Each structure stands twice: as structure tokens, then as C-alpha cells.
């Protein structure tokens, strides 16, 4: 039996009405906004990769892949510096 939530919302219709297609999003971004979005997405992605490396060590008791952690931290620094520059923020 469907829940009240499922009866009230048709997710396919909601997405069709509310979600912007990628071309529309891209067309609305100027160069500065695209840079900010790119660097923020990069931070998010690299954070997830760092979290996964730490999770594997802590939860699954695997040897910490220090080289990977160092690489992910470097990647985070890269995107964070790009975002700082894009926002005019200094360290």
C-alpha cells in the first residue's frame, strides 16, 4: 500500500516541471560563475574521495593508503585555491 507521501507526489512529473536541463544551466552561467561552480564541485568530489580513503581505513580496518590521502589532500588544495582566487579571498 502506498504511503501518503507517495500518493501526494509524482516524482517524474515534479522533475519534469522543476529540473533544469543541462544546456539551460550552462547557458545561464557566465565565465566567473562557471569557474566557481567547477571549483566547488571539485572540492565536493575530492572530499568524497578523501572520505572514502579514511572510511576504508577506519571502518574496514584496512591499511591507510597514505599516498592516496596525500594525493586527495593536494587535489583539495588545488580546488580550494581556485575557489579562493575566484572569490578574491586570500589565506
Please report, for each region that a protein language model flagged, where it lies by residue.
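Flexible "arm" and connector segments at domain edges
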Residues: 1-91
